[in-house]
């Protein structure tokens, strides 16, 4: 039996949030004439699930192991989210450029795909917050 207050609980919560956000992102792809089940759609889903997994694992580190400074959830989650979305934008720049040029996005005045990193910061922060509130944090968390 898996206890929710554990490392495994954090990972399950992160994967669930990542899966939900990935599915929602995939459902918006037809608005930009991008197939849902294409490489971009499935890569988007996989990226958010892996982001949830890593934010779950990062909950073990409430202090940096080498520099010894405090790393609360509001630092860890957005850092992981920004890193994942930066990698995502760098790998899918052309497709993200098409999305940013659509009429659904241009009215906001955002032209660069790198604005998506702000989404990663918000999503990573949400993942870190929910995982910490429901499953705890720190090196004393049980494995399962």
Predicted feature locations:
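Juxtamembrane/disordered regions of integral membrane proteins
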Residues: 1-144
């Amino acid at each position: 039996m898996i206890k929710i207050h554990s490392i495994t609980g954090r990972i399950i919560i992160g994967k669930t949030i990542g899966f939900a956000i990935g599915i929602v992102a995939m459902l918006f792809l037809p608005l930009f004439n991008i197939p849902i089940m294409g490489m971009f759609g499935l890569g988007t889903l996989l990226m958010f699930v892996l982001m949830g997994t890593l934010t779950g694992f990062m909950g073990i580190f409430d202090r940096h192991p080498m520099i010894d400074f405090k790393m609360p959830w509001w630092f860890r989650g957005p850092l992981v989210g920004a890193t994942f979305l930066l990698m995502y934008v760098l790998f899918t720049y052309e497709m993200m450029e098409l999305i940013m040029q659509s009429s659904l996005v241009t009215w906001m005045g955002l032209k660069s795909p790198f604005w998506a990193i702000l989404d990663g910061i918000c999503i990573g922060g949400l993942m870190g917050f929910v995982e910490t509130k429901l499953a705890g944090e720190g090196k004393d968390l049980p494995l399962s």
